[in-house]
Structure formats: structure tokens, C-alpha cells
Amino acid sequence: MENFHGTTIVSVRRGDQVVIGGDGQVTLGDTVMKGNARKVRRLYNGRVLAGFAGATADAFTLFERFESQLEKHRGNLTKAAVELVKDWRTDRMLRRLEALLAIADDKASLIISGNGDVIEPENGLIAIGSGGPFAQSAARALLENTELGARDIVEKSLIIAADICIYTNRNLTIEELETGRNFPNLA
């Protein structure tokens, strides 16, 4: 059986906003199975944003586990991520999951990797999935050279990735949080 492939998820922090967006394409081998999948969600009463890349069923398993950790740790994003990773590394079933999560709240943006790592990216920019390198390059250029807001940067970088990556489409889901904190621009 072939694996489901690809997606692109981008998260940007700028000003008092954090935004996560993703495309809607699900691909099996060389066939597009679905074009309007929703890979970005709000969790914990809308206070946490999360997006996934990788095998869809695996990602839903991780979403459920992560959401239960968020509840258990009263919305503490970092603690919930670390506890999820502990489970991931010790549970035989979880160790086989092929997915990445990009998560963010008003304080932090994190990547939970397929190896069971928690990574805080430089400059509040996350890009994962098959189109991630294209979207990251575009988002970084926009952060460094424009005054665009976080939502516009996420949208434009996803569209650029969709123009280049065959596993990414232009059917976008974008969620944003107002953080009340001011994030510096890349310099």
C-alpha cells in the first residue's frame, strides 16, 4: 500500500499576531485523493493553533494525544508538547507514526517532529511538509523585506509553495491568534 504524501504548513509570528496556515491536498502516490482537507485547527478553546503534515491518520492520532496533554496541563503548550514527546518515544505504536505538528499559542511556536523532538524555531517561523522549504524561503523573504502582516505572509508563502510543490494546492485554511505581545521582525 502506498503512503499518503505531502502538505505544506506555515506559521509566522509578527507584531501581535501568530498565524498558522496549510493547504488542503491529500495525495496517495501520484493521485490527488482530496483537495479540501482541513489540516489546521484550533485547540484548547481556541487558544492554541495546530497544523499537521504527513500521514493523515497518524496526524489525527497525534492531534488527539496532544489535545489530551493540553487539557491535562491546562493549556501549557510547552509542557503538553514535551509530555506528548515522552509518550511518543516510549509507546511502540506512536514511534511508527509519520507526521509532524506545528503548534502555537500566545507565547510560543513549536514543531513536534516525527523523531519525537520538540523544536522552537528561530524568529517564530515554521514551515513543514513537502512544500515546507519553498514556503519557508518565501516567508523569510517576506518577513525580511516587507511590512506585510503575519496572515498575508502565510497566505503568500503557501501560494508560492503550491506553485512549486506538486503535493501542495491553493485550497488554504488559515487560523490566527492575537497575542497581545509584539514580535520583532527578522533583521
Swiss-Prot record:
It comes from the Bacteria. Its main location: cytoplasm. It is an enzyme of class 3 (hydrolase). Na(+) binds at A162, C165, T168. The active site is at T7. Pfam families: Proteasome. Keywords: Allosteric enzyme, Cytoplasm, Hydrolase, Metal-binding, Protease, Sodium, Threonine protease. It catalyses: ATP-dependent cleavage of peptide bonds with broad specificity. One of its GO terms (biological process) is proteolysis involved in protein catabolic process. One of its GO terms (cellular component) is HslUV protease complex. InterPro entries: ATP-dep_Prtase_HsIV_su, Ntn_hydrolases_N, Proteasome_sua/b, Proteasome_suB-type. Protease subunit of a proteasome-like degradation complex believed to be a general protein degrading machinery. A double ring-shaped homohexamer of HslV is capped on each side by a ring-shaped HslU homohexamer. The assembly of the HslU/HslV complex is dependent on binding of ATP. CDD domains: protease_HslV (cd01913). Allosterically activated by HslU binding. Its EC number is 3.4.25.2. This is ATP-dependent protease subunit HslV. Belongs to the peptidase T1B family. HslV subfamily.
